[in-house]
Amino acid sequence: MGDLFSLFWEVDPPPIPLNCAIPNQDYECRKDDSCGTIGNFLLWYFVIVFVLMFFSRASVWMSEDKKDEGSGTSTSVRKASKETSYKWQSKDGAWDPSQTMKKPKQNQLTPVTNSEVALVNAYLEQRRARRQSQFNEVNQNQHDSDTTECGSEESNSEASSWKESESEHHPSPDSIKRRKMAQRQRNLGSYQMSERHCLHCKAMRTNEWLVHHSQQKASVTPPMKGDSPEESSISDINTKFSKF
């Protein structure tokens, strides 16, 4: 243990008497090889720690280099854009530093304003579509109400015409009585006319027969004195029939 501590700290060895012989340290180290193993372990330990630190630092350096390259490209792009803007301004006219200071802000706000304009346009289109749909619904409701009114009027007219036709097909009892009375009167008149015609024809025929028969008798037999009442009766009959 004394040898191990002597590697890290300097320990004053105890005084050696003059009579004692000094042992050989190389022989003891060869006999007990713990010094070499500890030294090798410490050596490899420091080597491994150094390698790990190197790799960690190398990764950090690489990431920083990439960031620097990206920032360099962005700065180069910015410089190029500025140069182009300067060129355009120099072509257009005099250069104004206030305009160059304001332009980056305007460039940053342009996409926001464009999106806002798009949103406002979309909102207005939605409102227009809603109003158009409401207007169409109102027109449709008015058209439906007009059609229902027309349909109700047509149905009422049809119902009234149907009632009139029913009243015509199904007359009232008063009209039936009137029709029967008129028909009876017509029948009586036609019967009376037919009877009158028949009596007149009979009278004419009898008159003709009597006249013809009397002429035949007159031609066959001359008239006698005693026959005067018969002739007078025949003449009376003829006069009566002629009057009738």
From Swiss-Prot:
First and last residue of the signal peptide: none
Keyword Transmembrane appears in the UniProt entry: yes
Cystine connections: none
Polar residues composition bias: residue spans: 97-112, 132-142, 231-244
Biased composition (Basic and acidic residues): 80-94, 161-176
Keyword Transmembrane: yes
Bilayer topology: Single-pass membrane protein
A UniProt-annotated Pfam family: DUF4636
Key words, A-Z: Membrane, Transmembrane, Transmembrane helix
GO cellular component: membrane
Spans annotated as Disordered: 65-112, 132-191, 213-244
Transmembrane segments annotated in the record for this chain: 35-55
Primary location: membrane
Compartment annotation: Membrane
Source domain of life: Eukaryota
Name used for this protein in its record: Serine-rich single-pass membrane protein 1
